[in-house]
Amino acid sequence: MAKFRYKFESIKKIKETFEKKIQKEISLIDLEIEKQNGLLESLAEEKNKSRNSLSGRSFIKISELQFQGEVQNLLGLREKKILSEIANLRKIKETRMLELEQKTKEHKIFETLEEKHYEDFLLVQNQIEQKEIDEIASKKFAREA
């Protein structure tokens, strides 16, 4: 029996490679989002610590109050920057997810096509084998007669 060779095997492997590449990109984006969320949490803690540093005192200088206001503004700007970065990463992740969905569909199509070609191959091989068996049987019958 002949060996089955799928004529689109190289294309299928390339599609698998692209699919794995996109999966890796998505996981890297997830890691970056987690990192940004961690930065956001630490920034929130820093904001609270900054606010609480003044609340325990009974006497506060105006310069300290102005300084704390500037610190709060700066922390707010950093928070906005991190939030916009997270939104941007989520947007990129969404596009990558759509690409992954498309690549998965393409991969599945090629797998289905391979199964169909394999079934056709088996059918042809069975027909060839049946012809050989019939030939052997007719030769054996001809010798006996």
Describe each region flagged by the PLM.
Residues 1-145:
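Charge-rich amphipathic alpha-helical interaction elements
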